[in-house]
Structure formats: structure tokens, C-alpha cells
Regions:
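C-terminal ends and interior cores of transmembrane alpha-helices
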Residues: 87-102, 296-309
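Flexible cytoplasmic inter-helical loops of multi-pass small-molecule transporters
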Residues: 190-214, 403-409
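Cytoplasmic helix-loop-helix junction between adjacent transmembrane helices
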Residues: 112-151
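C-terminal transmembrane helical hairpin of 12-TM major facilitator-type secondary transporters
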Residues: 287-333
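Extracytoplasmic gate region of multi-pass secondary transporters
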Residues: 33-34, 221-263, 270
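Cytoplasmic membrane-interface "Motif A"-like loop-to-helix N-cap segments
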Residues: 75-86, 282-295
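A late C-terminal transmembrane helix in Major Facilitator Superfamily
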Residues: 340-374
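Helix-loop-helix hairpin linking two adjacent transmembrane segments in secondary transporters
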Residues: 147-195
Length: 409
């Protein structure tokens, strides 16, 4: 295993970049189907609720496997587990595209999407050990912000390509896009991922090390972060899933125009995660920025609901603002968890974080689809604003970091 002192600064950032690409595959496999909802709804004859349920299937697979993947990451390291998990994800994504091209039933396509979701869980939990193991504390917020660009960038890739390909060549051709991205991520893991060294035991305990305690038993800090993140993911999931339908079906945008706006929004959101990470490094706090972001989320979703109710031309711009705000907190929560639990528990800690968020996404996607079909988008936007409102007072105070560092500045 490579020693910290033997690795260059450039190599650390290359490892982080490869981890970003690996995580981007998860977003494409799990969230990409949402960009086929307009085509499935208007051309394939599915109701909005049925299309939303199909789009949620990869999330169910991901959620079922994320914690087991986290345990394996903590035990065996990131490189080997990512190679295995992305291979499974690639098989599922490829199977879904092949099944759709063969006009197989939606049950068969859904089964393949489920397998793709099962394989996608490891990449999300892998970043904690890389960030804590390879980066000093004053760079971790920025590093995790860069790593967390994977979600909005993955959404941008899907938004820019999948609706256009589906409209011109059908859903089967569009389903090949997540498979191609996953293949690229697998190559990145092979070429670029190196596991950081494990934290050495203190000299006084060598030969008789104390048992590793469960960080969840110490206090409510981790539980509160998980709950807050589960609430804050609701606006993010809603916007990522239904904005294409909102723009194309409700407002008459072309798939190309909608995809371009969403892609630009996601790129800005990705950069916003880096800004949030730098902000948290400057404040030496992960939770205070999360609290500010939650309040901003309430304001943005409420403004979007009002603008859409009155058919304001400002609604698309407000959607973009709300989307950027909705993704800004993720890296901060991930960094706080990884720092608190340490490298030995980062896989499990981030697995619990991801499972909670994806559980909420999977549960709320069909419900929001039904709500939109019943009362329309403005009321659904307003209802979504309640989630960050509830989350704001639940944000915990920062916990003290451990004084030891694995790496030098």
C-alpha cells in the first residue's frame, strides 16, 4: 500500500478525480431513467405515476445494497470493492439497454435496472476514506466538495443526452448512456484509485489495541446529520426527477432546450459544492453552512412555487436557483460524517447516509408524481419547501475533530 509520505499532491487530486468519475456512474445508473419519464409518459403510454415508479427502481436496488457495500469497503479497501461493484453495475445497465432494445417487458427492464442499482452503492461510500486518508483537515471540505460534484455532473450528462436520444432513437438507445459512463468509471478505478494507508495504532496500544467503538453510540450527532440530510434531499430529488417533465410537458420546452438548461444548472450546482466546501474550510465548520443552506432552500422552493402558480417567466430561473441550493449541502454532511467516524468507519457511515437519502428519494418519487398529477406543479413545489423548513432546527452543532492528521498540509 502506498505510504502518505511517498505520494505527491498531484497524485492525491488524481485519485480524487478518479473517485469522482466512479461516483458519477452511480448518478447516471440510478438517476438517468428519470430523464426518460417524458418519453415514457407521452410516447410509451405510461402514466406519470407508472413512469416515476420505473425510474425509482434503480434507487431501490442501490438502497438495498449500500450498507453491505460500506461494510466491505471498511474491511477490504476501496479499489477492490469498486472494481467488483462497478462491474455489477455495468452488467445491470447494459442488461437494461439490451432488454429495452429487444422490446422486453417493463418487468425485465426493471429487473436489470435493479441489478444496476445494486452494484452502484459502493462508489458513494468510497470517498470518505479517500478524503480523510489523503487530505489534511483544512482541505477536506474542498476535496469532498469536488468529489460531490459527481451527482450534479452526472445529472447534467443525463439531462443533456438522454431526453434527446430518447426522442430521436427511443428509450433503449438512451439507456445505453449510463452503461457507457459506467464503463468509463470502471477504467478510472483500474488506472487511478489507490487506497490510503490505515491509521496506525497509538504506540501505547500497539500489541494490545483497544476495540473500535461504534461512533453511533457516542451521541446523536450522526443521527441528526442523517435526518437533516434525508429532509434536504427531498427538494433535490424532486427537482432532478420532475423538472424535465415540468419544462417539456407543462411548459412546452424542447428536449434539447430543457436538457441544456438542466445541464447548465447542474454545472453551476457542481461548482456550488466546491464553494460550499471552501466556505466550510474557512469557517472551520461543516454544520453552520448547512443551516444557512436549509433556510435558503425554503426561500427558493417557496419562490418557485409562487412563480409557477402565476405562470411567471421567472420560474425557470428560480428553478435553477433552487436546484443549485438543493445540492450545496451534500458535501458538507459527507465531510462531517467522514471526519467524525474516521477512516475505519467511513464506509459504513457514508453508507447509512446514502441509504437514508435514497430511501427518501425512492419513497417520495412516486408520491410526488401522484401529487403533481392531482394538484399540479406549483402545489408540489410548495409542499417540497416544507422539508428544509423542518430540517433547519434539527441541524446539530459541529463536533470537535480528532487532533491527529494522516497527511501534512
Amino acid at each position: 500500500m502506498t505510504d502518505v509520505d511517498d505520494i505527491t499532491t498531484a497524485r492525491r487530486w488524481i485519485i480524487l478525480g478518479c473517485s469522482l468519475l466512479a461516483a458519477l456512474t452511480t448518478t447516471c445508473v440510478v438517476s438517468g431513467v428519470a430523464y426518460l419519464i417524458p418519453t415514457l409518459h407521452t410516447d410509451a403510454g405510461l402514466t406519470l405515476t407508472q413512469a416515476s415508479a420505473l425510474a425509482a427502481i434503480p434507487t431501490v436496488g442501490l438502497m438495498a445494497a449500500t450498507i453491505p457495500w460500506g461494510i466491505l469497503l471498511d474491511r477490504y479497501g476501496e479499489r477492490r470493492i469498486l472494481l467488483l461493484s462497478l462491474s455489477i453495475s455495468l452488467a445491470g445497465a447494459t442488461g437494461a439497454a439490451v432488454a429495452a432494445s429487444a422490446d422486453a417487458s417493463y418487468a425485465v427492464v426493471g429487473a436489470a435496472l435493479f441489478v444496476g442499482g445494486l452494484g452502484s452503492g459502493a462508489a458513494n461510500g468510497a470517498s470518505g476514506r479517500i478524503v480523510v486518508g489523503w487530505f489534511p483537515a483544512h482541505q477536506r471540505g474542498t476535496a469532498m466538495g469536488i468529489r460531490q460534484m459527481a451527482q450534479p455532473l452526472g445529472i447534467g450528462v443525463c439531462a443533456l443526452t438522454m431526453p434527446v436520444v430518447a426522442a430521436s432513437s427511443g428509450p433503449a438507445a438512451a439507456l445505453a448512456i449510463p452503461a457507457v459512463v459506467t464503463a468509463a468509471g470502471l477504467v478510472a478505478v483500474v488506472v487511478g484509485i489507490t487506497d490510503p494507508p490505515r491509521r496506525p495504532a497509538p504506540a501505547s496500544t500497539v500489541g494490545n489495541p483497544p476495540p473500535r467503538t461504534n461512533p453511533y453510540r457516542d451521541n446523536s450527532f450522526l443521527a441528526r446529520i442523517h435526518i437533516v440530510s434525508m429532509l434536504l434531499v427531498i427538494p433535490q430529488s424532486m427537482l432532478w426527477t420532475f423538472v424535465p417533465t415540468w419544462l417539456i410537458v407543462a411548459h412546452g420546452w424542447s428536449p434539447a432546450g430543457a436538457g441544456t438548461l438542466i445541464t447548465v444548472t447542474q454545472i453551476i450546482g457542481a461548482l456550488g459544492r466546491i464553494v460550499a466546501g471552501r466556505w466550510s474550510d474557512a469557517w472551520m465548520s461543516r454544520m453552520r453552512p448547512v443551516r444557512v443552506i436549509a433556510v435558503a432552500g425554503v426561500a427558493a422552493m417557496s419562490a418557485l412555487a409562487i412563480a409557477d402558480w402565476f405562470d411567471s417567466p421567472l420560474a425557470p430561473a428560480l428553478m435553477a436557483v433552487a436546484s443549485v441550493i438543493s445540492v450545496a449541502d451534500n458535501g458538507l454532511a459527507f465531510t462531517a460524517i467522514a471526519e467524525y467516524v474516521g477512516p475505519e468507519w467511513s464506509g459504513r457511515g457514508l453508507a447509512v447516509q446514502n441509504t437514508g437519502q435514497y430511501l427518501v428519494s425512492a419513497a417520495t418519487t412516486p408520491l410526488l408524481g401522484a401529487l403533481i398529477a392531482t394538484v399540479g406543479f406549483p402545489i408540489a413545489f410548495a409542499a417540497t419547501a416544507l422539508a428544509p423548513l423542518v430540517a433547519t432546527p434539527l441541524v446539530p452543532r459541529d463536533r470537535m475533530r480528532e487532533p491527529d492528521e494522516l497527511v501534512d498540509a
